[in-house]
């Protein structure tokens, strides 16, 4: 892993206070400050008013020789007339503002308002502009960038924003979680298949013995480490209690390779399985049973028979948009393994960065892993997502995994029975790779033209005009160039070499394949020539050509390909016949209303499917519409109850409420939709969560968006056939409520205290509020929490009134927070008038 920490280059010049606010401080400062404000909605159809207030904080008039840059989630910007300061997009989510000929020098202390229109209304604070910096120009030379102080004004009337959590609906929803019985010893996450109590108990007090054959040495070592670190139990040769890891004598019991038995009696804990993976799963169950206990640890005699329903249970982590260090990713791997998840989808490349060292293609990290101020991207990419303007700074915008880092990650994950599936985003979402290979071309073009063009991914003569979903105009690889396939095979072979050195098998590489914009390739001479040569009639034929070529390259290298759902859509039957046999997994993500049938259509067509449903498993979707909840919302809101609600074999019944929190008619939701056939059912391999990083600014934010909502993913991957799935009407609702209540009890009683003890960040839910007959009622989904509230409009804190029972309330506004495990939730507001 590389974090760049070189000092910021010195200023090119600072000849006047107005250029860099030089003043009396040794540290140069920008001569301006900014205040951003969201204006009126629907200034014109599809556009919303925004404004910056630009203030001259220097001691001299502000001339016309400057540009201010900033980042913001992608959107169109436009202005009416001839503004004094122009605001425009540079590319994607990177913008700039600069004075026009209409600009008159701004006197010291004076301010001016810069108004512009944006597509997309901003209804959460994490979508506001950020990363503002100033660059001045003199005699054709730029100064070094300087940060600009940005004050973001609160969104107007946040409680009236669409999606703002309704305190009364939350209260009513929480009522279904009442009257839950006490947890049993085996009530863990994910739930075990079968548990049987017995007479007696075992007590673990300070020391424990551990017996195992050589085949389970790794599992024994990891168990020993966890017993010591988490519970203070020392493993010794002889102790009153022995934990035995054994091979299953009746291997016919093993439903699959991850099956295990766990038996506890008076002096022995026995974990039996047919494979090391099964043994590992059994050790995680034992460790989970200890979570809610105190030393000395008493475990009642019992037996467990357990196995997963789905053999693929994964989580995708995006380290491209914003960087997660290898140590933090290992922390996640350890946590995922504790919940018996078994795949890490390693999203290391995208438009905004390339994060893995590839020998022979050094530009991928020398250029593609760094973001900072640049006018030509010859040494770094443009800033974005608040990654900063300094390409050498230790920010979330900069960094990559060295070859050694990645090999270490592979070994670490493999010991914990987690496969790492790398993803090379292609042909779309490939801007970082495209820019990096342009830099390589420019480096060699004057000395070795053949070497310069060897891995080029773009055609200089291409005049295609397009905009991706993220508003990039240059992020798609040219699929007609032989150098494209040399590049892809080079990366694949280098990846395979890393896996070999790690001693870890590589079966597939994920090739991306999603969100290729309309209009790509149409202006490419090479693509037009290829279309003519191959008798192609439409642009999709080029996409089909790319994926079939890549499938052959993968097969030539002993691998199968994986990709997002687009890799299996719209092809000729001939292409389908080829791809079905060469696919390891098609990751179906777009299940928004109107598109949700695609998942089962792909499975019915013979492709192996991984369910990645945006409405249930996109962890980067905000928990709800509160303006201070980070995340996106294009696919809905996802919290721990929504992930728990997902039904792999009844996906149309997987979203129980709409965006406003109103109940959905589940019977109507599935009516007339594509039915999963018996063959299609066999093609559902598993489930996966996605965590894209556009709104993440720290590892703390990674954990916040994962926990607790990832618990629903872990549960549903292990137990894919919940009891309520086959029920209907009131019986179905009652069974679901009972299961959900138990799930929340496990999270609040077992998981949240564990996370708090072990430095894992997590989110607390809002309390629900109701004012009825002049009294304030409150509740919360988790047990053991405090609800504190105010009635004067102020923000609740740890000293605010504690709600314990209905209290008289005639205030026009009530604000409340949940407090638990040293944390507090975001405040929720209930207006009673």
Residue positions per predicted region:
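Short, compositionally stereotyped local motifs that mark structural "simplifiers"
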Residues: 20, 211, 730-833
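Intrinsically disordered, low-complexity Pro/Gly/Ser/Thr-rich segments with frequent PxxP/GP/PP motifs
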Residues: 82-122, 554
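Short beta-strand elements of extracellular/lumenal beta-sandwich folds
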Residues: 33-61
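Short acidic, flexible loop segments centered on an aromatic residue
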Residues: 42, 60-91, 132
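Feature activates predominantly on carbohydrate-active enzymes
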Residues: 257-475, 481-508, 688-689
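Flexible, acidic glycine-rich loops studded with aromatic residues
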Residues: 560-568, 573-769
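Active-site neighborhood of glycoside hydrolase catalytic domains
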Residues: 468-583, 591-595, 599-601
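Acidic, contiguous N-terminal accessory segments
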Residues: 23-27, 128-308, 562-569, 760-766
């Amino acid at each position: 892993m590389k974090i760049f920490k070189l000092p910021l280059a010195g200023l090119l010049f600072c000849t006047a206070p107005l250029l860099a606010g030089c003043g009396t401080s040794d540290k140069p400062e920008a001569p301006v400050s900014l205040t951003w404000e969201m204006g009126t909605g629907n200034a014109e159809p599809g556009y919303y008013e925004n404004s910056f207030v630009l203030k001259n904080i220097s001691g001299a008039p502000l001339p016309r020789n400057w540009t201010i840059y900033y980042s913001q989630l992608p959107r169109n910007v436009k202005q009416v007339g001839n503004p004094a300061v122009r605001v425009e997009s540079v590319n994607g989510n990177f913008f700039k503002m600069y004075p026009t000929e209409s600009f008159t020098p701004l006197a010291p202390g004076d301010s001016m308002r810069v108004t512009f229109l944006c597509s997309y209304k901003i209804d959460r604070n994490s979508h506001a502009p950020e990363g503002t910096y100033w660059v001045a120009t003199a005699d054709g030379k730029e100064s070094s960038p300087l940060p600009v102080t940005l004050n973001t004004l609160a969104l107007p009337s946040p409680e009236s924003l669409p999606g703002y959590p309704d305190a009364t609906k939350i209260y009513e929803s929480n009522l279904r979680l009442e009257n839950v019985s006490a947890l049993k010893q085996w009530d863990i996450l994910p739930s075990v298949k079968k548990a049987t109590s017995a007479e007696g108990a075992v007590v673990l007090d300070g020391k424990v013995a551990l017996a195992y054959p050589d085949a389970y040495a790794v599992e024994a070592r990891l168990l020993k480490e966890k017993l010591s670190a988490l519970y203070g139990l020392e493993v010794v040769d002889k102790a009153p209690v022995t934990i035995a890891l054994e091979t299953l004598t009746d291997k016919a019991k093993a439903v699959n390779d991850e099956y295990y038995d766990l038996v506890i009696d008076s002096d022995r804990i026995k974990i039996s399985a047919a494979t090391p993976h099964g043994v590992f799963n059994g050790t995680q169950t034992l460790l989970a049973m200890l979570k809610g206990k105190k030393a000395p640890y008493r475990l009642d005699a019992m037996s467990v028979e357990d196995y997963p329903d789905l053999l693929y249970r994964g989580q995708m982590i995006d380290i491209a948009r914003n960087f997660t260090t290898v140590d933090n990713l290992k922390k996640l791997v350890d946590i995922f393994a504790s919940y018996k998840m078994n795949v890490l989808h390693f999203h290391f490349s995208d438009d905004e960065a390339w994060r893995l060292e590839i020998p022979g293609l050094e530009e991928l990290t020398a250029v593609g892993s760094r973001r900072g101020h640049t006018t030509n991207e010859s040494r770094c990419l443009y800033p974005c997502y608040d990654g900063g303007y300094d390409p050498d700074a230790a920010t979330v915008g900069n960094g990559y995994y060295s070859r050694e880092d990645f090999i270490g990650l592979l070994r670490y994950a493999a010991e914990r029975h987690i496969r790492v599936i790398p993803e090379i985003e292609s042909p779309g979402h490939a801007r970082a790779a495209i820019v990096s290979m342009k830099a390589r071309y420019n480096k060699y073009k004057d000395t070795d033209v053949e070497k310069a063009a060897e891995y080029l991914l773009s055609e200089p003569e291409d005049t295609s005009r397009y905009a991706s979903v993220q508003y990039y105009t240059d992020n798609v690889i040219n699929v007609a160039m032989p150098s494209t396939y040399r590049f892809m095979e080079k990366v694949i072979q280098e990846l395979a070499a890393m896996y070999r050195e790690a001693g870890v098998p590589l079966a597939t590489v994920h090739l991306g394949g999603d969100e290729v914009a309309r209009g790509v390739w149409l202006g490419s001479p090479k693509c037009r020539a290829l279309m003519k040569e191959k008798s192609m009639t439409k642009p999709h034929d080029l996409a089909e050509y790319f994926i079939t070529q890549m499938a052959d390259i993968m097969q030539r290298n002993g691998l199968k390909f994986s990709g997002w759902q687009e890799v299996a859509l719209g092809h000729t039957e001939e292409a389908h016949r080829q791809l079905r046999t060469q696919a390891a997994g098609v990751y179906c993500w777009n299940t928004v209303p109107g598109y949700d049938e695609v998942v089962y259509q792909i499975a019915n067509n013979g492709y192996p499917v991984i369910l990645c449903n945006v409405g249930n498993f996109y962890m980067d979707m905000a928990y709800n519409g509160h303006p201070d909840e980070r995340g996106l919302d294009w696919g809905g809101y996802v919290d721990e109850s929504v992930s728990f609600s997902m039904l792999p074999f009844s996906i149309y019944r997987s979203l129980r409420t709409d965006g406003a929190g109103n109940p959905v008619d589940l019977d109507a939701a599935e009516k007339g939709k594509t039915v999963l056939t018996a063959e299609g059912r066999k093609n559902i391999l598993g489930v996966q969560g996605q965590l894209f990083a556009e709104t993440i600014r720290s590892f703390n934010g990674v954990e916040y968006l994962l926990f607790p909502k990832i618990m629903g993913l872990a549960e549903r991957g292990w137990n894919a056939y919940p009891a309520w799935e086959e029920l209907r009407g009131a019986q179905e609702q009652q069974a679901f409520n009972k299961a959900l209540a138990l799930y929340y009890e496990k999270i609040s009683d077992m998981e949240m205290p564990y996370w708090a003890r072990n430095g894992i960040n997590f989110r607390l839910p809002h309390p629900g509020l109701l004012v009825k007959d002049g009294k304030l009622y409150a509740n919360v989904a988790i047990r053991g929490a405090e609800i504190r509230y105010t009635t004067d409009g102020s923000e609740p804190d740890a000293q605010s009134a504690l709600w314990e029972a209905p209290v008289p309330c005639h205030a026009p506004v009530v604000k409340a927070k949940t407090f638990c495990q040293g944390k507090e939730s975001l405040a929720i507001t209930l207006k009673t008038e």
